[in-house]
């Protein structure tokens, strides 16, 4: 991502003048559609067709070149064939145009010559400083200004454009506009839409960074196929967090097939999905699984309301719908609690005796003949101190919809708590009226519950990590270990060096001594005392247990001497006659974790935690965080593991020392951050947890170095 030039991005978002290079007089052609759309919807700025063969385009004066235009040009849309795009963008930069949109395909997404062409485009961008959206994109639209430099068909339905507080960025052009159209149909108003295409210059992260600063944007939505600039995206997330503007994101490529398709479609590298998932959760980005969830969340976030808690009160015409809502709400992390008796008595005064004043409140079908009941019930619900969110479940009832909607609107305007309506069946007219009033409306209780669950997660999100580097790190030891390994031309540290490295960062390690031969191993065991482990210590063999290179719980001189000799024989057979031995004190603790660090191509150094030992791949229970982390964020990673109940008291076993484990995770995250240029991967496996107060100990560690630059 280039250096942020917010002025250029703002002129892209709010262009007062737009030049169309290669503008066609034919409004049906792709190169003619931008002018037709902006004329139809009333663009308020200057529209400047560039066509060397015509004096007029679609009734507008045409210009032979950019140089023939007087005054500033905020934005150019380059509607030229791919082989003419580079010259066109260069002309724009020469003319002083700050931003351009490139619609043509045939660049990096097709490989070969297209990649070379995209590199030429990037060279021009680097030389001139012009900002470019695309190539291989269908443009953008700003509904506030009716600026529509796009050739989309999303506006061909003849309807009005619904402007609103949501701005949407999509790496996919066509599918992005499908989502835009669905949002409009669902009553979700959009302020800006931008398609980033191949991201030769402007990335999703940078576009979101520009949008988050606009007053008209209260909610950001993103459809992602890959993330090139993960750290920049997280910087935007931090800014959005400060402004209380949610980022709602759908990222495809969870499966290998999806990742391959995403890469071939937009020439983007789909990073490891688990890293994206952990990074976005850590920074408050709301990740959603598809278009339906994205739009549903958009509806409940768009009015800017937040919830103080997870307690949902439901009023339902149907008892069955209320039960379904309660189930779905619970599945999405919400609480549906019966009201206390005093409040139930108040509700019982306004509903039939055969209804239920508990929560969910069953208003019964009497509501159809007495729609005023809903107003009275909602007044009580709004006053109820144990209600954080409100859901009203209705269905059919077209003839009674007027007073019902009036009651809902009155309640909605009288409270700042989130209030949603589920209106199932009927003609759809009640839902459209609610949409026009700005009240979130759904057809399915489950979808409403899922959206409210996401709203609660965001509203109650923890603070972003504010990690402070520990002041007891021994940087001199760290530099010495790395210097020695580099001078020897090695690609990994052996276990002893790796353990010394993490110990320099304050990670407790099991006592150990290296030994050159069986006699030295016996002497080391005597010094350590108690049962010991004897392991191969090799600069070349990484996973010792795979070749039988570990002996555990050894006592007695002869037992240790025999085991040591056998291990050296194994090393010779494995091709490392220079291998040594590591004699290590057996450690306490019976809960095994793995804590690893790695460098992600998009997000940089990350930390991976999970339940470990030799079954780490089988258990596949892990969480990812972006380094550096503080202790609180590290603890949240650990408690997010599926097996996190093992940290508590289980069948008489005392609780594990979770705080000590979190401290180790935080310290290793600083190692990942500090040594990102030196350490490609590092695994502590296992990290043994003892009971509360007895701490943790790292038993085995392996660090892989980055390849030296040529």
What function would you assign to each model-found segment?
Residues 1-710:
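Catalytic-core regions of core metabolic enzymes
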């Amino acid at each position: 991502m280039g250096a942020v030039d917010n002025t250029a991005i703002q002129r892209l978002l709010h262009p007062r003048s737009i030049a169309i290079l290669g503008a066609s007089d034919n409004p049906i052609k792709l190169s003619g559609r931008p002018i037709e759309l902006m004329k139809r919807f009333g663009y308020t700025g200057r529209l400047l067709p560039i066509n060397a063969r015509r004096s007029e385009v679609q009734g507008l004066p045409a210009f032979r070149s950019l140089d023939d235009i007087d005054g500033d040009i905020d934005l150019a849309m380059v509607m030229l064939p791919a082989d003419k795009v580079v010259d066109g963008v260069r002309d724009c930069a020469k003319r002083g145009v700050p931003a351009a949109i490139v619609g043509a395909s045939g660049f990096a997404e097709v490989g070969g010559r297209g990649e070379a062409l995209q590199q030429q485009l990037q060279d021009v961008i680097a030389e001139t400083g012009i900002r470019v959206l695309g190539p291989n994109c269908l443009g953008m639209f700003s509904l506030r200004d009716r600026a529509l430099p796009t050739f989309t068909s999303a506006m061909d339905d003849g309807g009005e454009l619904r402007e609103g507080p949501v701005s949407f960025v999509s790496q996919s052009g066509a599918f992005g506009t499908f989502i835009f159209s669905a949002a409009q149909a669902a009553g979700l108003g959009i302020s800006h839409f931008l398609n980033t295409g191949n991201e030769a210059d402007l990335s999703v992260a940078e576009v979101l960074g520009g949008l988050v600063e606009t007053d008209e944007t209260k909610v950001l939505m993103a459809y992602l196929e890959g993330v090139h600039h993960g750290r920049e995206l997280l910087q935007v997330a931090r800014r959005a967090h400060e402004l209380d503007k949610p980022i709602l994101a759908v990222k495809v490529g969870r499966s290998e097939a999806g990742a391959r398709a995403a890469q071939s479609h937009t020439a983007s590298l789909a990073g490891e999905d688990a890293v994206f998932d952990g990074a976005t959760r850590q920074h408050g980005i709301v990740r959603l699984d598809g278009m339906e969830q994205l739009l549903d969340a958009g509806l409940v976030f768009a009015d800017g309301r937040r919830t103080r808690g997870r307690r949902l009160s439901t009023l339902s015409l149907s008892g069955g719908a209320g039960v379904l809502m309660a189930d779905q709400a619970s599945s999405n992390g919400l609480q549906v609690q019966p009201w206390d008796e005093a409040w139930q008595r108040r509700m019982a005064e306004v509903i039939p005796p055969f209804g239920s004043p508990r929560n969910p409140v069953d208003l019964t079908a009497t509501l159809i003949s007495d729609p005023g009941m809903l107003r009275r019930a909602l007044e009580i619900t709004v006053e109820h101190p144990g209600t954080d969110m409100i859901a009203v479940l209705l269905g059919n009832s077209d003839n009674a919809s007027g007073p019902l909607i009036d009651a809902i609107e009155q309640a909605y305007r009288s409270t700042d708590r989130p209030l949603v309506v589920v209106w199932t069946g009927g003609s759809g007219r009640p839902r459209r009226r609610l949409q026009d009033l700005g009240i979130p409306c759904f057809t399915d209780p489950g979808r409403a519950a899922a959206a409210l669950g996401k709203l609660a997660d965001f509203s109650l999100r923890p603070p972003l990590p504010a990690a402070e580097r520990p002041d007891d790190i021994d940087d001199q030891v760290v530099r010495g270990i790395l210097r020695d390994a580099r001078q020897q031309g090695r690609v990994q540290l052996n276990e002893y060096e790796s353990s010394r490295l993490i110990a320099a960062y304050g990670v407790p390690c099991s006592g150990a001594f290296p030994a050159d031969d069986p006699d030295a191993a016996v002497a080391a065991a005597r010094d350590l005392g108690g049962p010991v482990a004897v392991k191969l210590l090799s600069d070349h063999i990484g996973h010792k247990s795979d070749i039988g290179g570990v002996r555990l719980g050894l006592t007695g001189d002869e037992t240790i001497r025999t085991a040591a000799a056998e291990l050296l024989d194994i090393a010779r057979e494995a091709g490392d006659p220079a291998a040594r031995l590591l004699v290590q004190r057996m450690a306490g603790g019976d809960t095994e974790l793995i804590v690893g660090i790695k460098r992600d191509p998009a997000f940089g150094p990350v930390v991976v935690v999970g339940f470990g030992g030799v079954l780490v791949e089988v258990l596949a229970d892990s969480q990812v965080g972006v380094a550096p982390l503080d202790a609180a964020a590290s603890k949240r990673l650990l408690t997010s593991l599926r097996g996190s109940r093992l940290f508590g008291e289980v069948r008489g076993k005392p609780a594990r020392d979770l705080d000590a484990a979190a401290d180790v995770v935080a310290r290793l995250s600083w190692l990942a951050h500090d040594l990102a240029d030196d350490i490609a991967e590092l695994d502590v496996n296992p990290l043994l947890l003892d009971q509360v107060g007895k701490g943790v100990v790292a038993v085995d560690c392996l660090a892989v170095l980055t390849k030296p630059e040529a």
